[in-house]
A protein has these predicted regions:
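Catalytic phosphate/metal-binding cores of nucleic-acid and nucleotide-processing enzymes, i.e., regions
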Residues: 128-131, 152
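Conserved acidic donor-binding segment of nucleotide-sugar-dependent glycosyltransferases
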Residues: 122-128, 138-142
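Short alpha-helical segment that forms part of, or immediately flanks, the ligand-binding pocket
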Residues: 69, 92-99, 113
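Glycine-centered loop/turn motifs
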Residues: 118-119
Length: 171
């Protein structure tokens, strides 16, 4: 992310913004995982292990094609904490989770709210307190959580096919 200029390193404004967004998102994810793991069984699939998250079960890398669909489908709650640098659009992870029939609790993005009914097809949180309250609620209400996961799966299967995407693009 840096451009070498002689013995100096120059970082563009855009590169700096991206690095800060990654750092901010990393800290946000750390706080969320720390909070949730103090109250609920919390598992993380990632190459990176943070030793400070002592109550989080670290499961290492999950293969996108072979393991992730199973994980997404069987997790009680799949968290999507979107990278702060991504300001618009529906994160692919949200569609992946819903396409596997998983329940997704996601940070707010305008396009998610435009395309999905909050509380019907997915659950969107606004801040840390809202995320915790919704995680607690849906862990205690399994039938409601499963109903939302099924509705989200049906929506993705119906509206987010390659054919539909091509029609919108070529429209």
């Amino acid at each position: 992310y840096a451009k070498a200029s002689g013995d100096k390193v120059q970082v563009t404004r855009r590169e700096l913004e991206y690095m800060l967004a990654c750092e901010t998102t990393g800290r946000e994810r750390f706080v969320i995982l720390g909070l949730l793991s103090q109250h609920f069984k919390t598992a993380l699939w990632s190459n990176e292990k943070d030793e400070r998250l002592t109550h989080v079960t670290h499961n290492g890398y999950a293969d996108y094609y072979k393991q992730m669909p199973y994980i997404f489908h069987n997790a009680k709650i799949n968290l999507n904490i979107a990278l702060r640098a991504i300001q618009t659009g529906i994160p692919l992870r949200v569609l992946d989770i819903m396409g596997c029939g998983g329940f997704v609790l996601t940070s707010y993005r305008e396009e998610i709210a435009e395309h999905f009914v909050n509380g019907e097809e997915c659950v969107i949180y606004e801040n840390l307190e809202d995320m915790y309250a919704k995680a607690k609620f849906y862990l205690e209400h399994e039938e409601e959580r499963q109903r939302i996961a099924i509705s989200g799966f049906e929506k993705v299967r119906r509206d987010f096919t390659f054919d539909n995407a091509l029609r919108r693009i070529l429209g």
